[in-house]
């Protein structure tokens, strides 16, 4: 029953309307996605596959989470959804912890991102798995090429790399190095991993993790997108005449009936 309630609360957070939240850009992004048929369809698919928590060995976890299926649905969302809307959900700016927690939960971290253990593994583990993966390796290389500062410089970023940096960062979601927001008090992002247990390879481990946690090019690209988000959403949704909340209430009610 506890897992059902957890899944129900997550569903409300993911698909909830502005009546449950104070106005903020993450709510605006969610409503814009709901008003777009393609975005809403793909979003509903990943929500349905990502409820619950991950379990060891790829087995279905509490609430029905199968991480491989969840991550596949997330890759479809970013590959096939309107980029202006998918990126608005991913990079919406927040000023308070409630907004930041909504943003952190948007892509179902309990299934797609963290665990199944309580302690994150060494970053060398997902990095090595990514380097052996035909799916993950080219995406990570693209992220490094488009988002990493130039060698020997902390601040010199690839020319005109902002939009491409965001695109290739989003391409990592749904891979073995899926990044997410780490908490609800900052905008720090990283894969689910650390470097405390990396032994004599700690420097290599930290270099990988800092691609996310201390990357001025990625931070700058996210901040630039946030400054443009209102006009981006206005352009994307111009002319839409969808009801603001009827889709949300109907979908949420049906899903809750199935869970309870």
Swiss-Prot record:
Propeptide: 238-260
Signal peptide start and end residues: 1-23
Residues carrying sugar: 184
Superkingdom, taxonomy of origin: Eukaryota
The keyword Signal is annotated on this UniProt entry: yes
Lipid-bearing positions (GPI-anchor amidated threonine): 237
Tissue: Expressed in many tissues including adrenal medulla, brain neurons, with highest levels in the cerebral cortex and hippocampus. Moderate levels found in the gut circular muscle and myenteric ganglia as well as in other peripheral ganglia, including the sensory dorsal root and trigeminal as well as superior cervical and sympathetic chain ganglia. Isoform a1, isoform a2, isoform b1 and isoform b2 are exclusively found in the thyroid, parthyroid and pituitary glands.
Gene Ontology MF term list: coreceptor activity; glial cell-derived neurotrophic factor receptor activity
Keyword Transcription appears in the UniProt entry: no
Keyword field: Cell membrane, Glycoprotein, GPI-anchor, Lipoprotein, Membrane, Receptor, Secreted, Signal
Record's GO cellular component terms: extracellular region; plasma membrane; side of membrane
Matches recorded under Pfam families: GDNF
Alphabetized InterPro entries for the sequence: GDNF/GAS1 (IPR016017), GDNF_alpha (IPR037193), GDNF_rcpt (IPR003438)
GO biological-process terms attached to the record: cell surface receptor protein tyrosine kinase signaling pathway; glial cell-derived neurotrophic factor receptor signaling pathway; negative regulation of ossification; ossification
Job of this protein: Receptor for persephin (PSPN), a growth factor that exhibits neurotrophic activity on mesencephalic dopaminergic and motor neurons. Acts by binding to its coreceptor, GFRA4, leading to autophosphorylation and activation of the RET receptor. May be important in C-cell development and, in the postnatal development of the adrenal medulla.
Family to which the UniProt record says this protein belongs: Belongs to the GDNFR family.
Subunit composition and interactions: Interacts with ARTN ligand and RET: forms a 2:2:2 ternary complex composed of ARTN ligand, GFRA3 and RET receptor. Interacts with SORL1.
Protein name, per record: GDNF family receptor alpha-4
Organism whose genome encodes this protein: Mus musculus
Taxonomic classification: Eukaryota, Metazoa, Chordata, Craniata, Vertebrata
Gene: Gfra4
